[in-house]
Amino acid sequence: MENFQRYFLMFSILIFSYFLLIRWDPPNENSSENSISIDSERPLINDPIDFEETAPFNENLSNIKAIDNVCAANNIKTLESPYWSLDIDLKKGEIVKTTLKNYPVEIDSKGKKILFNKCGPEKYSHTSGFEFLNKELNPDKNFFSVKETYTSDNKIFVVLEKTEKNLLFKKIISYKNDDYFVSVTDSVLNVSASEVTLAPFSKIDRSSVDLNADENSIFNPASFAYLGPAFQTSSDNYNKISFSDLSEDNFRELSTKGWASMLEHYFISAIVPEEGTNFIFQARKSTKSDVFSIGLVGETNSIAPNREASFNQKVYFGPKIKKELQKAHPELDLAVDYGWLWWIGQPMYSAMSFFHNLTGNWGWSIVLVTILIKVLLWPLSMVSYRNM
């Protein structure tokens, strides 16, 4: 019995020390944005580009007429894969709806899970493009059109184009049939006689409406699961920022890597930019409605006549399945919150996935993981039995 108590005490000290270590946050001399060295001759935007202040972000989402225009589906391009369908509003090239074909709303339900849903109470959408600092545009008059669609290297490419004020905009959306993300390349060609200054941006909008809020029950995990933004940046692998926190203060952080995501219980949407480029990751609440914007803004860039600027990203919209998330980004699976026992949860999930691939049944996977844990803990159990 004494040996068992000794082992238990040692184990408790180790666990306590571990949590003390991961919670310790040493002073960071280079924590401020101004102190980060930037290997680029092009400066970042001196004055913060605020989502609410830029042209693509100043739409009043409480304006019913504006939302009805999107819901009328007069200018919608629909993309299809075996896994999902995706609706693009050609006015802005905005993703306004995604339907996940393999996930019913409820068991035995014919209705399918809708993630992006600008016309629903969530006001959930994704937009990307360029913000111009010395040129005003009117996107309501110039819509994108489908220039071409083709297949190459098992990927489907859809090319959207529009011209406005001597600027040629192009949005190339590519995807594979077995992925839950699309690759998006936004580009603009300056065909005017003068230089233009711009910055790329990408953002996800969503209200704080929780569709599971009316189903509060200990038997419905979705009713009390986290709903809100999460980021990965150069300084933090996983940073949850709740809607309540954003109601009090905005989030801004300079980073050359990472992603911005919007989480719910079983599903996630995320923006994954190319690494190695300076971005300011942002999140804020609209001053006009209960809509929160998360995303990123890139460096300012001056484009000479007949020159082009481009911006590459991936947009994920699908289930929290590790192998699917890692297709979009090797560390996007960190968005799956295992809680404070993640160091136990992650290997257990990996073991369950391994056994599921062998048996094709989650029930047997749980049984086999239980047996595996019993085998691994047998030496400790044997010691405790001897000292009883």
What are the residue ranges of the model-derived segments?
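Membrane-protein biogenesis/insertion across secretory and organellar systems
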Residues: 1-371, 375
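Juxtamembrane interface at the cytosolic side of transmembrane helices
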Residues: 375-388
